[in-house]
Amino acid sequence: MISRFSRLRQFFARKVADVFSTKEEPHITEHRELLLAGAEIPPPWAVYPHAETWWGGWRQGTSEYWLHDIWLPFWKGLDANAKEAYLAKWNVTDEWRENLSARE
């Protein structure tokens, strides 16, 4: 069950994303549509190449919404073999691999 806080956070995150996605971060809309279509979403190190691995998306804006409501649901929907293939395809660094392992 989703907590009331989580529902509110998701609601406001979507509103922020809707306002800013077309101007400042157009990939938000594109990636949300890919997620809904069941397609592959580029990883954080490709979308936000200057972000540190410890970042975790806590920037309280569109990048937080992207990580927590678009990319992580995509990532968590992959099985172990699909995750390994995805990481190989996107040339994951050791630091990002460790970060993702901690999220399992």
Regions found by a protein language model. Name each.
Residues 2-104:
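Polar/charged low-complexity regulatory segments
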